Amino acid sequence: MFRMLAKASVTLGSRAAGWVRTMGSYQLLVPPPEALSKPLSVPTRLLLGPGPSNLAPRVLAAGSLRMIGHMQKEMLQIMEEIKQGIQYVFQTRNPLTLVVSGSGHCAMETALFNLLEPGDSFLTGTNGIWGMRAAEIADRIGARVHQMIKKPGEHYTLQEVEEGLAQHKPVLLFLVHGESSTGVVQPLDGFGELCHRYQCLLLVDSVASLGGVPIYMDQQGIDIMYSSSQKVLNAPPGISLISFNDKAKYKVYSRKTKPVSFYTDITYLAKLWGCEGETRVIHHTTPVTSLYCLRESLALIAEQGLENCWRRHREATAHLHKHLQEMGLKFFVKDPEIRLPTITTVTVPAGYNWRDIVSYVLDHFSIEISGGLGPTEERVLRIGLLGYNATTENVDRVAEALREALQHCPKNKL
């Protein structure tokens, strides 16, 4: 065989000869990893943290379906059904509605990269980690970033936002509907109309709230909204949902400069997802299996009905709050009206280390809960009731685990 290749190299010239020599000149320095000789093993756990969440059986089954080409007609039909599902859960008729092949962070960047240009004034509500992240991304773009900073656990009023709009005259306002790091749900009624009076677009992050908390993109005047797959939707992490209305689309398509990212350029993604009615154009290879799962998760919500889904989360969370109050735990968010129904934050009880509690619940009950994030790190425990997991049975399980953890975890009496 080698003689045949060597003879061919003489015929083809020096380039081919170099290729033949390369094939035989090097030895493998890295052996096959021993770990990969063993079958993959994953523990069985109840995921009651801020996400990801457990997959419903139907969604899990979708992940094992056969692979098909990402631009074949059958896949394009699935993509069309996903778009319709997003329009339902977003409550929007926006044609420019699609999936971003990346996590919620990628959706945030997709929105900001496409809407902001260097020098644009950008106003963000920073009452948790996600406002901080939005400010960081906008700063990297070269926007003039203005933050309305509030204490974690607080929300924004129309008056406060209007003062920011009048002072900074932004082209874009960013608000988080469900702030997963603090457990706050931000009221949205009136904010879209207010922004439009000041010629400003409203961008809303609904990653931790979509499907579990009422939100109406069109009726509430939200110009751009995004969410993610792994929380209430109960799909695998790694893809996100986004929608632009006509005002936001005009801002994107009338840019003076190209977006800083080719991968998240919405003008290309719109063609890939058939949002303009034209022949679809390949931009990147979409995550086919993840889209199968997302399609099924959206179908489950459509079958259940949004109002029923919202009610189930509200009832399960009320049941959880009752247990927490009986244990003497204190809610991090003082105002009951702005407590996020999908993710509850409780202050770490005095004398306890949050890591001990989280570890005990995991080790003894195979239940995942979480500590704080960003401004709430070391300060809170976070308990998530997301989609398929939002049941009173699961609440009773995690309440039992917490009670036992508080009895057995070391407590500093000083």
Curated annotation (Swiss-Prot):
The modification N6-(pyridoxal phosphate)lysine is found at K231. Residues 1-23 form a transit peptide. A motif (Microbody targeting signal) lies at residues 412-414. Substrate binds at R382. The keyword Signal does not apply. One of its GO terms (biological process) is glyoxylate catabolic process. Pfam families: Aminotran_5. PROSITE patterns: AA_TRANSFER_CLASS_5. It is an enzyme of class 2 (transferase). Its EC number is 2.6.1.44, 2.6.1.51. The modification N6-succinyllysine is found at K247, K330. Its cofactor is pyridoxal 5'-phosphate. GO terms for molecular function: alanine-glyoxylate transaminase activity; amino acid binding; L-serine-pyruvate transaminase activity; protein homodimerization activity; pyridoxal phosphate binding. InterPro entries: Aminotrans_V_dom, Aminotrans_V_PyrdxlP_BS, PyrdxlP-dep_Trfase, PyrdxlP-dep_Trfase_major, PyrdxlP-dep_Trfase_small, SP_NH2Trfase/AEP_transaminase. The modification N6-acetyllysine is found at K247, K256, K330, K334. GO terms for cellular component: mitochondrial matrix; mitochondrion; peroxisomal matrix; peroxisome. Keywords: Acetylation, Aminotransferase, Mitochondrion, Peroxisome, Pyridoxal phosphate, Transferase, Transit peptide. Belongs to the class-V pyridoxal-phosphate-dependent aminotransferase family. Homodimer. This is Alanine--glyoxylate aminotransferase. The lineage of its organism: Eukaryota, Metazoa, Chordata, Craniata, Vertebrata. The gene is Agxt.
